[in-house]
Amino acid sequence: MIKEPEFRDYTPGKLEEKIEEFWKENNIYQKIKELRKNGPKYYFLDGPPYVSGAIHLGTAWNKIIKDMIIRFRTMQGYNVWRQPGFDMHGLPIEVKVEQALGLKTKKEIEEKIGVENFIKKCKEFALNNLKIMTEQFKMLGIWMDWDDPYMTIKNEYIESAWFTLKKAWEKGLLEKDKRVLHWCPRCETALAEHEVRGEYKLRKDPSIYVKFPIEGKENEYLLIWTTTPWTLPANLAVSAHPEYDYVKVKVEFNGKEEYWILAKALVDKVLGEIGVKGEVIEEFKGRELEGLRYIHVLMDEYPRQKEFREKYEWAHRIILADFVTLEEGTGLVHTAPGHGEEDFEVGKKYGLPIYSPVDDQGRYVEGKWKGIYVKEADPQIIEHLKEKGYLVKAGEIEHKYPHCWRCKTPLIFRATDQWFLKVSKVKDRIIKENDEKVTWYPDWVKIRFDNGVRDSGDWVISRQRYWGIPLPIWQSEDGEIYVVGSWRELVELAVAIEVNGERIDLPESYEEKLKVIEEKLGPEDLHRPYVDAFIIKVNGKEMRRVKDVVDVWFDSGIASWASLGYPRNKELFEKLWPADFIVEGEDQVTKWFYSQQAASVIAFDTVPYRRVAMHGYVLDEKGDKMSKSLGNIIRPEEVVEKAGRDTFRFYMLWATNPWENLKFSWKGVEQVRRMLNILWNVYVLSATYMSLDNFDPRNVKVEELAFREEDKWILSRVNSLIREVENGIETFYLTKATRALYNFVVEDLSRWYVRLIRKRLWVEGDDPDKLAAYYTLWKVFDVLLRLMAPFTPYITEEIYQNLMRPFIGIESVHMLDWPKVDESAVDEDLEKEMEFIRRIVEAGSAARQKARIKLRYPVRKIIIETQDETVKKAVERLNYILRDQLNAKEVVIGKVERELTVKPNFAKVGPEFKGDSRLVAKWINEHGLELYEKGEVDVEIEGKKFHLTREHIIVEEKLPDFLVAEDFEGGRVYVDKTLTRELLAEGLAREFVRRIQEMRKRLDLDVNDRIVVTIETTDDNRELLQENLDYIMRETRAIEVRFEEAKGYVVEWPEVQAKIGIEKVE
């Protein structure tokens, strides 16, 4: 049976700890999985967070969304695959471990600690953080298979990556190439496009104009502009656009007459910046400049430039390129094929060498600035050019520049040999598969995704690092390669292993090989340096592994099949794949969402997921990013501690549309906590009365109950709510779901329905009207708790255990089925009509306030004036609610006669009619009522025609003295403010009842406790109160009311000129 609630007040901390204990003791999570094991499959793929640190509000938001979806699908009957994942390789981990160990370079890693120890430390760090993050996620009430997460460091996961790369190789989609790529000089590795997107930050760099002397021409120069002086030693050409107009300009510079060549369209801008005047001497098209040779400004400092000049026909000449623009610079572009993507391509076209005299740490390997970091060389190069007379102007520019996504070092462009996945060959397939098979939430993200795929180049997947999936590429001395697809294949092909520099030949038998390998290297571990030891033989050639590891984005890109252990475990893959749903932050559109589709189309020719949703970032209340420097970081634990898990969860799904950025607000959190407090109070009220009356819904004969209109209305509303919430979740418009729930709890259930039925709950004994209210409340909770369970799992469980479980029998609210709409209960007309009733009550209350009549004093009559048929039906059907809520003896539809005065609105008449405004005003004073009634008229005054509307008039109305009015959307409410003796007596009785009930509350009396009331008051009050003594006794549970000296617990109430005493009857 229903008991009185354990907690009278809503205390999230205690309640949630109690429920956590209940779930744990009763193994609820496992029971739910068992319950749904035969349901239709639903493959939810968890995007793996990096285990590089504690979770933040953004991570929490992400997991809360996921948990809500998983709980929702489970209640729908699905057997949900809910394995959490963790991204455990890559630079995010390496950088943290380097910091912890005080290491700054790759050389220090190899010499001070060693690769094997460094990898061991990375693994320890990753596993330790996995434990911390798991506990943090559990703290939020996230129900996933925490005992069996997928980890990208497991052998079977790595083997999935090898399988995928072998597939790419077999399809001709994996190849080695030399290209110019983003390079991090601190991490000493190449980075892919998707790692750099979103990592452009404002920084200041040099901005210099330099003149290149034209060979054989005295005082004639090519004028170039650059923000990377450090690339000038690698300059091999100057690019011009074939169709642009270029000019030779005569200038006076440093006391000398010189001739500069630059784009005609940029002459004024460039000369203005430099601060010189010029005269155009000659004009020509860019294509006419092709082949013009110049003298390299740093030829002496970089002797290899002399070799290039002699060996390559197009070295140090103007070449033609379409990438040249007129947006900045001079229209002549300094071109270094070893340090720019476009430079590289045009350099290849003209047969230029790919020269990059820079090492992995971004230091020059030769020439004047050998050993110096390139960005530190910038000022030295500028000063040197000035000394040589080639510097025209030096300044500074603030621009967006790419930085390393993990260590935040400014990147450089550098030509290196790397391994690429040829995504360019499958782009069209990716877009086609995406457009045909993937549903995006919101749908406009699909366009953004497709555009990102179109703009992407080949995927550089090699990284010159340590802690990652080793590239399964073995290479012979003559350059032949072989890609290994599995551990078994590696063992089968292995002929030897190298341990501490010593070669150990392996036996031919697979089993015997395994014994030797395990004895010498230890158990299978597909990381470096374990796999580096293997020497394989293919086509009669011995091969050793290339030392690179795989881009960490490839790790997560294969998650949909690697997490299932494919290809080692084919059964799960065949049962579940592709994923039914994924959801991640906005930055993953061009990262994880992209890497998955690219890897999947390469491996399986199709997409790896069917539905994908995107959410925004969490910012502070002002819209700023949370950071240590701003001191505005709010930790998830802090929110849970202050407001509780349910409040935190609901708030994150209620505050904003999921695809928008969430500006975290403590006020919003408190607003949600108040809503849950309201829900709790409705539960406490319901459970308290139901427990007193031993209410049992199983014994109710529903067909015999006389439900009131408000009962039918709330049952209709809660069934309509099912549609609203379900639609909000299904379309990923989560705020529609949460705000519908919020409004239902606060407005429909608490502020309206409970307000309407409170008196019915006070009735003693077996009252059918009270029973109908009990049953209605119980049915509402039955639906509402199911709807709220995925959002607020704790409070719904606590209420369910007391209010519902005794009669339903199922062990947990989370084991219930998602509610289905009872179409027979839905009455849309009633819902519309009740909405008008609420508006009328609001307007009527405002009218009473105008008249200064308290709600406790009844009024004689209320008139509703309306033209709306729905309002008329509502007033007729729900008249008793209006009478009760507005405390009126009579509520009628009618028309009130009042005096109308129409005057000219000179603010409109004057400006519009100017000199004729007096004529128009005179007409309005005489015929204004006609204009008011018709809305607009065309009139002729003294031979002139005018079009007049209600905008041209001001209407003043005079009501009868006994009425006061207030408008509502749909009509107007009139309150008759005449107070008779009978009405005064009734109102005064209500005033005293309210005060006696307040005193009962202060004494913490039970609703069934009886009292004796004694009242000291004025003679007038006593006479009025005696007319309603029965009412006072009934409402206050008093057995007697005496007018004498107040006794017992006494309170003086000056506003009603009384002292009231109450005594509990034992």
UniProtKB/Swiss-Prot annotation:
Pfam families linked: Anticodon_1 (PF08264), DUF5915 (PF19302), tRNA-synt_1 (PF00133)
InterPro entries: aa-tRNA-synth_I_CS, aa-tRNA-synth_Ia, Anticodon_Ile_ABEc, Ile-tRNA-ligase, Ile-tRNA-ligase_type2, M/V/L/I-tRNA-synth_anticd-bd, Rossmann-like_a/b/a_fold, tRNAsynth_Ia_anticodon-bd
Any one Gene Ontology molecular-function term assigned to this protein's record: ATP binding
SUPFAM superfamilies documented for this protein: Anticodon-binding domain of a subclass of class I aminoacyl-tRNA synthetases, Nucleotidylyl transferase, ValRS/IleRS/LeuRS editing domain
Gene Ontology biological process terms in this record: isoleucyl-tRNA aminoacylation
TM ranges: none
GO annotations of cellular component type: cytoplasm
EC nos: 6.1.1.5
Catalytic activity of the protein: tRNA(Ile) + L-isoleucine + ATP = L-isoleucyl-tRNA(Ile) + AMP + diphosphate
Domain notes: IleRS has two distinct active sites: one for aminoacylation and one for editing. The misactivated valine is translocated from the active site to the editing site, which sterically excludes the correctly activated isoleucine. The single editing site contains two valyl binding pockets, one specific for each substrate (Val-AMP or Val-tRNA(Ile)).
Subunit structure as annotated in this protein's UniProt entry: Monomer.
Family classification: Belongs to the class-I aminoacyl-tRNA synthetase family. IleS type 2 subfamily.
Protein name per Swiss-Prot or TrEMBL: Isoleucine--tRNA ligase
Organism in which the protein naturally occurs: Pyrococcus horikoshii (strain ATCC 700860 / DSM 12428 / JCM 9974 / NBRC 100139 / OT-3)
